[in-house]
Regions:
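Beta-strand-rich binding/interaction modules
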Residues: 506-525
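Short, solvent-exposed loop/turn segments at secondary-structure junctions
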Residues: 15-17, 52-54, 99-100, 163, ...
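Acidic/aromatic-lined carbohydrate-recognition and catalytic surfaces
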Residues: 2-183, 187, 200-253, 257-261, ...
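Active-site clefts of carbohydrate-active enzymes
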Residues: 312-333
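Hydrophobic residues within beta-strands of alpha/beta enzymes
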Residues: 46, 193-195
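C-terminal beta-strand-rich structural cap/linker in extracellular carbohydrate-active enzymes
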Residues: 531-550
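Loop/helix patches that line or flank the sugar-binding groove of alpha-linked glycan CAZymes
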Residues: 4-5, 227-229, 233-236, 249, ...
Length: 550
């Protein structure tokens, strides 16, 4: 297995990263242009979200050809140059494999529509009448999870958009096709893979109505998932690659199996439970303040259980589907800098592999779009109409989108203070964040030792410098309040203790360990330290502190 305990991954959403040809869309040459910046940041892998040919109904997660580059992003030669240039700087590329579904424009689906039974078996088609849907399962993007094709008198399953048809992994030919795609990219010099919603690919043989939910309990972590993953990794020859699975509505038990080295499935897992603590009754589109007690409990559960079972966590707050974490759990104004640093430190020093999403390292904020016309995300547009239909006012629906839309993370990267943030010379495909201001740019933070960007560089360097962060055991400390999370990492004689104040109030916490007198390794306030003789410590708003013997 690859050694990934001291590595850090940087996620790039190419469409919004850097536009070099003036069409308003980011491109592969834009990634090449910024490689020196990424090398200086200190990251090891660059995860690129899909750049494959796609009708872009779901921003590239509707793939029409897995072994080509969409001309919008550049050419295969550009990509090969990116692979070479990244490698020359000690960084590997991680590609995003969307294997639960293809675009309905993919040649396989087109052949299926034309009546080719071989290719109909590549997907999940069910015979039926237009007025009798196979099951009551719901799409992740709203509405039914089935689509009727009158010409075929069949329904096809699509857990996401109508243009994203689910693949039939029970068909060995499908699995062989997917292995071939991995081999193709492996031969191009790709060093790592991220598998999109991979725990949804194994569907039950008999599909039935779900009267208790939206159907997910029948297909999440499905009947043959572990068997199929082992086969995919083994036969594609990627056992020694860094691999990460995006796991939708999964459990710790399954993630231990997915990521324990002896299982030979994946290196690590993304789970999203900690990012649902502000979902009212588990509903993404129902807002409520974050439940900090729940957040703490989830971190403790996933860290401790994965450690016990030899599993490995992918540590993250942000990605192309999530709102900006500073807007969500931090503070956009008075404590912008402190809260961004605290949130970064909280996950970077845990047991697992940290992921940074573009712009997170400079504290980028949510989009805050004032009108529906500015949104582009298919999920957001669908749910805007669902919210209105369910009785919300236009103002309420927009407030919900402002907090939850995936477009929050997709606004153009803010390189400098120019009109379009140095992303492009022309109007970008998605409007700039309304929270765009000069201090939230790479240029403003690059040479400032107190900046959020400098703080991220320090965190990345610490993981490489101190084995206790990469390899140490984790345990959690009782702080006496749900607003402060504290944990300890230990490896032999090395130890660090991390304190994180999760909100904008001062909190006095229990702090009576022998480590109180240890040197402060990193903090987000100036010259603060604990009294070696005391038993409590009063934390400033969003304060972060690491003490240690390393």
């Amino acid at each position: 297995m690859a050694d990934f305990s001291n590595k850090v991954v940087y996620q790039i959403y190419p469409k919004s990263f850097r536009d070099t040809n003036g069409d308003g869309f980011g491109d592969i040459l834009g990634v090449i242009e910024k490689l020196d910046y990424l090398q200086e940041l200190g990251v090891d892998y660059l995860w690129l979200t899909p750049f494959f040919p796609s009708p872009q109904h779901d921003n590239g997660y509707d793939v029409a050809d897995y072994c080509a580059v969409d001309p919008k992003f550049g050419t295969m030669e550009d990509l090969e140059e990116l692979i070479r240039q990244s490698e020359a700087r000690g960084m590997g590329l991680m590609l995003d494999m969307v294997f639960n579904h293809t675009s309905t424009e993919h040649i396989w689906f087109q052949k299926a529509l034309a009546g080719d039974e071989t290719y109909q078996k590549y997907y999940i088609f069910k015979d039926g009448r237009p007025d009798r849907i196979p099951t009551n399962w719901q799409s992740k993007f709203g509405g039914p999870a089935w689509e009727y094709v009158p010409a075929l008198k069949k329904w096809y399953l699509r857990l996401y958009d109508v243009t994203q048809a689910d693949l039939n992994w029970d068909n060995p030919r499908v699995r062989e096709e997917l292995k071939e795609i991995l081999r193709f990219w492996k031969n191009k010099g790709i060093k790592a893979f991220r598998f999109d919603v991979i725990n949804l690919v194994s569907k039950p043989e008999v599909m039935e109505d779900d009267f208790l939910g939206d159907g997910r309990r029948f297909y999440s972590d499905g009947p043959h998932i572990h068997e199929y993953l082992k086969e995919l990794v083994r036969d594609a020859g990627i056992e020694d690659f860094v691999t990460v699975g995006e796991m939708s509505s999964t459990s710790v038990k399954h993630c231990i199996r997915y990521s324990a080295p002896e299982e030979k499935e994946l290196s690590m897992c993304f789970n999203f439970h900690h990012l649902k603590v502000d979902y009212k009754d588990g509903d993404k589109w129902a807002l409520m303040p974050a439940d900090y007690q729940k957040l703490k409990e989830l971190f403790i559960e996933w860290q401790i259980q994965m450690q016990k079972g030899h599993g490995w966590n992918a540590l993250f707050w942000c990605n192309h589907d999530q709102p900006r974490i500073v807007s969500r759990l931090g503070d956009e104004t008075a404590y912008w800098k402190q809260s961004a640093k605290m949130l970064a430190g909280l996950i970077h020093l845990m047991r697992g592999t940290p992921y940074i999403y573009q712009g997170e390292e400079i504290g980028m904020l949510n989009a805050h779009y004032p009108s529906i016309e500015q949104y582009r995300d298919v999920e957001s547009l669908n749910y805007y109409h669902i919210l209105l239909k369910n009785g919300k006012t236009e103002k309420e629906a927009l407030e919900t989108l402002a907090a939850r839309s995936r477009d929050n993370s997709r606004t153009p990267m803010q390189w400098n203070g120019e009109r379009y943030g140095g992303f492009s010379e022309v109007e970008p495909w998605l409007p700039m964040s309304a929270g765009f201001r000069n201090e939230i740019t790479v240029e403003a933070q690059q040479n400032d030792q107190d900046s959020i960007l400098s703080f991220y560089k320090k965190l990345i360097a610490m993981r490489k410098m101190y084995p206790v962060i990469a390899e140490g055991e984790i345990s959690f400390l009782e702080t006496g309040t749900d607003r402060v999370l504290a944990y300890q990492r230990k490896l032999g004689e090395q130890q660090i203790v991390v304190f994180c104040n999760l909100d904008g109030e001062k909190h006095t916490v229990k702090a009576d360990g022998a480590w109180r007198g240890d040197p402060v390794l990193l903090e987000n306030y100036e010259a603060r330290q604990m009294d070696p003789e005391g038993e409590t410590y009063t934390m400033e708003p969003y304060e972060f502190m690491v003490l240690g013997k390393v």
